[in-house]
Amino acid sequence: MDRKYMIRWDAPEGFDPTSVLMSLPSPIAPGVREIYNYSVKEEGFYFVDRQVDPRTAGEALKLFIDEALKHSNEVIIENL
């Protein structure tokens, strides 16, 4: 069963997510199974943990949270 999160934060105008996206671990596990998925939205980052590889998904989730905290004093993580 997937675990879905919305990482809400106020991104600065002109925010470019390229650096965080380029630092993410591969979302594909051996056997071509998806470990996690994400999308960059106006209100923050949407993240889906496929429950395939908790270590890799956790690393990716942490990178998104750290990126939000670099640019905003308040970050809200919703478990959807």
Predicted regions and their residues:
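Short, extreme N-terminal segment that most often corresponds to the first beta-strand
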Residues: 1-21
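A short amphipathic beta-strand at an alpha->beta junction
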Residues: 72-80
